């Protein structure tokens, strides 16, 4: 049974441009799915509709069988985490630890549990030795792993990655693959927008 569904979804920007028209998709838990296509094909708009950053003009998005219209954007984001293409659009704290821990701190979780979760996630993302560093002491490509960690640590059911391999070297791309496999092993849905066909061939069985 699909956990995340788009049913006949359409979206038009205020300037009149129709970015998504009558799109239907289904995603089951434990799936790893690549979304490919030309620039301007509506890929990022589509995943923003999944995450609640945008709302459909027609059709509906269902998460766990419930329409996202019943939830605020913040409530949707707890279940559908979205890692932006540009990490600098999501980094606001003055240390990598604080950036990863931010959502947990807002949840009221105790410090010991936060420390444990942050360290586990930082290790997964190759950041365990730089937690006290300022995020901008790391390269642009490494900052992508900070934003991935900040989403993964919140344990959403769906993780959306927008062009995660852009600007990454081979080792970093391999780490991305390991992170995605770790997530799907936990029965999470991983949806990745990418133009990296080598990455698609290596990591994905399902491509949209």
For each feature predicted by the language model, list its residue ranges.
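Conserved ABC ATPase signature
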Residues: 134-138
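H-loop/switch region of ABC-family ATPase nucleotide-binding domains
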Residues: 194-195
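The feature captures the beta-strand-to-loop junction immediately N-terminal to the Walker
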Residues: 36-38
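Helix-to-loop junction immediately C-terminal to a conserved catalytic motif
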Residues: 51
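Conserved ABC ATPase "signature" region
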Residues: 112-130
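Catalytic Walker B motif of ABC-type/P-loop ATPase nucleotide-binding domains
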Residues: 159-162
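Conserved ABC transporter NBD signature motif
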Residues: 59-67, 76
